[in-house]
Amino acid sequence: VMSGEFEVKMRELDDGLALDKPNVVIVMIGEDDRVPLKSSSGRKVAIMSPEWRAEYARRLDRMMKSVKVKNAGVYWVGLPILARNDAAAQAQGMNEVIRERANLNGFRYVDVFSSFADEAGLYSAYGPDLTGKVRVLRGGDGVHFTEAGNQKLAHFVEKELRRDLNQAKAD
């Protein structure tokens, strides 16, 4: 979202959604967005500064608008805890913006931040998989997931989706 090619990527998203016409859209973005911006005057804008947050919110709204017009059920997945403390703090701040924008746009926000933390709330590459066995869930970079981690991540999204589908059946 924070790349210099944002508008190009949004046109590609619009084109893709026009072709596919999905009923459900699941979105997870953010790790690559932890970069400073350049203001129109060329100065660096620090990550998580008020100006950065405002621009991040604007770009999220633009992306969400593209998805919203398709009348699909949208599940926006927040960032998990990250290994480096500064990265984890930035991820939490970004999740605040994502959650706010998702709620304002009528999307379901899926919070997974603490689901990949240890009992003390700190990053751990290990945790229970879907069977309860403790396994490596995160890659060596402290950001990405292993296969078991991806399955656990998908489980949290599936849980929200199933709950909404069951509620829709009941209504």
What are these regions (language model features)?
Residues 1-4, 15, 45-54, 64, ...:
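Second-shell loop/turn segments in exported
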Residues 1-55:
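Conserved SGNH/GDSL esterase-like catalytic core that processes O-acyl groups on lipids
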Residues 12-16, 62-66, 100, 160:
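A generic secondary-structure signal
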Residues 28-34, 38, 61-96, 113:
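Active-site segments of SGNH/GDSL-like serine hydrolases
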Residues 39-44, 78-79, 134-138:
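A short small-residue
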Residues 81-171:
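Catalytic His-Asp segment of secreted/periplasmic serine-dependent ester chemistry enzymes
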Residues 8, 12, 24, 48-51, ...:
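Extracytoplasmic/secreted proteins, especially bacterial periplasmic and envelope-associated proteins
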Residues 20-25, 68-75, 105-108:
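Loop/turn elements at helix/coil->beta-strand transitions in domains of secreted/extracellular proteins
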